[in-house]
Amino acid sequence: MEIEESNLKWLRTEFIATKKPPEPKAPLQPPLPPSKRKGKPPKSPRRRSSRIKPGDLIDYRNISLIGRFISQQGKILSRRVNRVTLKQQRRLTIAIKQARILSSLPFHATDQLFKIKRKIKRRESTARKKRKKGFRKRPKK
């Protein structure tokens, strides 16, 4: 069954004419300016200072440095908590494990480690208190 070319043109025009364009679901609105947008404002990138200074040596013998990166339970703290880079965190974990094996650091939390810290804190907090002016001792006559 052959359809003539003129009939084909007519079919095409009829089909296109009866087809309706899709209606938009919501009216299109221009984007709001940044001051009128809802939600959280954009955060500016903030550079955090590292707890390890450039001159510090990450080593199993440097216990004063390593001790800052261990929790009270004796666990190694995460990178987020420590605020160190990936390379520094890897070196820290290796140094902590070496210090534990050589028994410089305990595997579990001990009282001795935290008693030392408490003593240091007490010494710092027992600084001289300023006397109030109204309560001075009067010299004896």
Swiss-Prot record:
Residues 24-34 have a biased composition (Pro residues). The lineage of its organism: Eukaryota, Viridiplantae, Streptophyta, Embryophyta, Tracheophyta. It holds the Pfam family Ribosomal_S18. Gene3D superfamilies: Ribosomal protein S18 (4.10.640.10). Its main location: plastid. Residues 14-55, 120-141 are annotated as: Disordered. One of its GO terms (biological process) is translation. Belongs to the bacterial ribosomal protein bS18 family. This is Small ribosomal subunit protein bS18c. PANTHER family: 30S RIBOSOMAL PROTEIN S18, SMALL RIBOSOMAL SUBUNIT PROTEIN BS18M. Part of the 30S ribosomal subunit. One of its GO terms (cellular component) is mitochondrial small ribosomal subunit. Residues 35-51 have a biased composition (Basic residues). InterPro entries: Ribosomal_bS18 (IPR001648), Ribosomal_bS18_sf (IPR036870). It is found in: Plastid, Chloroplast. One of its GO terms (molecular function) is small ribosomal subunit rRNA binding. Keywords: Chloroplast, Plastid, Ribonucleoprotein, Ribosomal protein, RNA-binding, rRNA-binding.
